[in-house]
């Protein structure tokens, strides 16, 4: 599996509509998704799944001829977790992987009950691209729960992959074997936790990611009274005393979380329509806001912006980590309120011929 920083053919996205995730008919969410899709399309192709009944709304907000609308039914818009994960062989052949999706926990603690259409996304995108795919089911794995360096190292969290709602019949060793088998990784590094109060059970893509092989960014706070502090400290200590698949020690860049916790307001709770059994938030609930949830498209970085003073700090740090990429801050509050962020709504489709990081 190539690193996200390697060249892409394009990016998979899904047009938002779910009334329990996106309020007031997803109007604000669609504006944010359109801004992100257009920004990515300046650098690579965008393959956007959209329900037939919502196609007109997408056409109204999108203009780039690099954005390809693909009619398909979906339950929600989290392309990172429902889309195919792609691998490349030494001859430049590309295949998707059809992993099992159970809405982040199935009957144990899943966020919604019906996800039949979400399960079809991997096969549909592979068919559209003309790629074959491996069927890895019933192994449950979301794209947001892993990060790879393209050289044999994988990052994940115990909090997520060992959650009872994922693969309760598999041991840790058996999960590692599945990851090695399908992603061709050699070393799996298990951080204990993800970001505090992450409803996905601590996805790695909110907590830690690769800048390049041997170099990572880690969500951080210096406030020892913040519940995130112990989580970040545990990850830092582990990363400081381990090596990657090639025997390299890690260079660790601390990327601060927002200085002020971002919480759900009473106003945020208006305009939703929930189905039976769907997860609902409460006013005052802290959201899992993290600048780590940026997305690396070709030649650019799409960085979530929260209206916090650390927005500028995060942009400066990423500018130093990715000097050859344009840093594009995007107002991401509406996506955060929906349950994720920029990385969660995008899934890279690697170029068939692997190359150096961009």
What are these regions (language model features)?
Residues 1-358:
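Histidine/cysteine-enriched polar flanking segments
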């Amino acid at each position: 599996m190539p690193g996200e920083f390697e060249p892409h053919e394009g990016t998979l996205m899904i047009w938002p509509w779910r009334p329990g995730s996106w309020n007031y008919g997803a109007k604000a969410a669609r504006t944010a998704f359109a801004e992100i899709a257009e920004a990515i399309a300046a650098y690579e192709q965008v393959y956007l799944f959209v329900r037939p009944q919502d196609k007109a709304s997408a056409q109204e907000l999108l203009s780039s001829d690099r954005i390809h609308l693909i009619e398909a039914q979906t339950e929600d818009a989290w392309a990172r977790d429902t889309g195919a994960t792609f691998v490349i062989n030494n001859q430049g052949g590309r295949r998707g992987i059809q992993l099992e999706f159970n809405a982040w926990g199935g009957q144990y603690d899943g966020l919604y009950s019906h996800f039949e259409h979400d399960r079809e996304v991997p096969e549909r995108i592979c068919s559209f691209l003309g790629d074959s795919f491996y069927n890895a089911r019933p192994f449950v794995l979301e794209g947001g729960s892993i990060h790879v360096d393209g050289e044999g190292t994988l990052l994940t969290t115990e909090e997520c992959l060992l959650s009872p709602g994922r693969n309760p019949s598999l041991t840790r060793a058996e999960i590692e074997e599945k990851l090695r088998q399908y992603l061709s990784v050699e070393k799996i590094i298990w951080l204990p936790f993800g970001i505090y109060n992450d409803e996905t059970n601590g996805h790695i893509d909110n907590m830690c990611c690769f800048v390049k092989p041997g170099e990572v960014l880690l969500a951080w706070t210096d406030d020892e009274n913040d519940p995130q502090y112990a989580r970040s400290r545990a990850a830092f200590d582990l990363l400081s005393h381990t090596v990657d698949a090639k025997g390299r020690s890690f260079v660790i860049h601390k990327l601060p979380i927002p200085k002020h916790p971002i919480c759900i307001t009473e106003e945020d709770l208006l305009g939703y329509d929930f189905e039976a059994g769907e997860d609902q938030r409460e006013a005052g609930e802290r959201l899992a806001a993290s600048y780590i949830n940026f997305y690396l498209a070709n030649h650019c970085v799409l960085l979530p912006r929260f209206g916090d003073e650390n927005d500028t700090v995060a942009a400066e740090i990423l500018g130093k980590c990715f000097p050859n990429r344009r840093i594009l801050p995007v107002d991401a509050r509406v996506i955060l309120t929906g349950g994720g962020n920029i990385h969660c709504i995008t899934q890279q489709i690697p170029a068939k011929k692997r190359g150096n990081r961009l």
